[in-house]
């Protein structure tokens, strides 16, 4: 089973999920024979095997979301029209529903002097703060960073673990200034959620200028200052 729009030569494995509602089934056989496609006990299509021994079938009407147990039979081209026993079923799931919108990411500072959560609108001296959150296990979280007034850019991704948690840290320093982080969730079928609400932080790792004593005021007494 090949999802439309996928990389040529790639195929869905049994039990996998796709967002493609018109997946293509293909195979090989005896030229002139007819391949019958079944979902459970219901015939949903057929295709004739061409002169090179190949066949393919794509639904003309999009399939609704759900689980499909696909099997094949072959009908001989002879006048008897004998039909083979069905093949071993292959189960696929069609899922076009996007995941729920993720919650706003949490930002954590791990550089002294002040460590811990960085709230929306606050500053941090951590050039590689940790972002974390929760989601559906095995969904992929994509992190977007809008620097200043620029456009949001995808800067990293991480898979939600079996406990529903995720955590991501930039591989390199993210740079001084304002960063607004959002996140999306992508499920196994490739459906991507709308972005989360954003959290804006300001990275400031520059120490203040060294203070200079410019004057000492005091009453003079023999040339000294009391």
Identify the role of each PLM range:
Residues 53-57, 164-168:
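Short strand-edge motifs at loop-to-beta-strand transitions and within beta-strands
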Residues 72-74, 183:
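Hydrophobic/tyrosine-rich beta-strand signature of extracellular beta-sandwich/beta-rich modules
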Residues 28-33, 134-140:
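Short proline/glycine-enriched turn/loop motifs at strand-loop junctions of beta-rich domains
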Residues 21-25, 127-131, 225-226:
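Structural beta-strand segments of beta-rich domains
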Residues 1-6, 78, 83-113, 187-192, ...:
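Flexible, low-complexity linkers/stalks enriched in Thr/Pro that connect modular domains
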Residues 44-52, 153-162:
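Short, acidic Ser/Thr/Gly-rich low-complexity loop/linker segments typical of extracellular
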Residues 60-69, 171-178:
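Surface-exposed, short loops/turns at beta-strand junctions within beta-sandwich domains
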């Amino acid at each position: 089973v090949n999802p439309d729009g996928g990389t040529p030569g790639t195929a869905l494995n049994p039990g996998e999920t796709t967002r493609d509602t018109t997946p293509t089934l293909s195979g090989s056989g005896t030229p002139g024979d007819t391949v019958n496609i079944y979902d459970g006990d219901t015939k949903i299509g057929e295709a004739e095997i061409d002169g090179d021994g190949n066949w393919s079938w794509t639904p003309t009407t999009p399939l609704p979301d759900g689980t499909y147990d696909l099997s094949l039979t072959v009908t001989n081209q002879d006048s008897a029209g004998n039909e083979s026993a069905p093949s071993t079923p292959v189960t696929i799931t069609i899922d076009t529903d996007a995941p729920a919108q993720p919650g706003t990411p949490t930002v954590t500072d791990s550089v002294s002097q002040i460590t811990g959560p960085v709230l929306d609108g606050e500053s941090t001296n951590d050039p590689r703060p940790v972002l974390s959150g929760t989601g559906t296990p095995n969904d992929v979280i994509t992190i977007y960073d809008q620097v200043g007034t620029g456009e949001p850019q995808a800067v990293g991704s991480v898979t939600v673990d079996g406990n529903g948690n995720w955590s991501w840290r930039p591989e390199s320093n993210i740079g001084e200034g304002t960063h607004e982080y959002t996140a999306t969730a992508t499920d196994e079928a490739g459906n991507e959620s709308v972005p989360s609400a954003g959290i804006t932080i300001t990275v400031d790792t520059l120490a203040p200028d060294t203070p200079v004593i410019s004057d000492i005021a005091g009453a003079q007494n023999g040339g000294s200052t009391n």
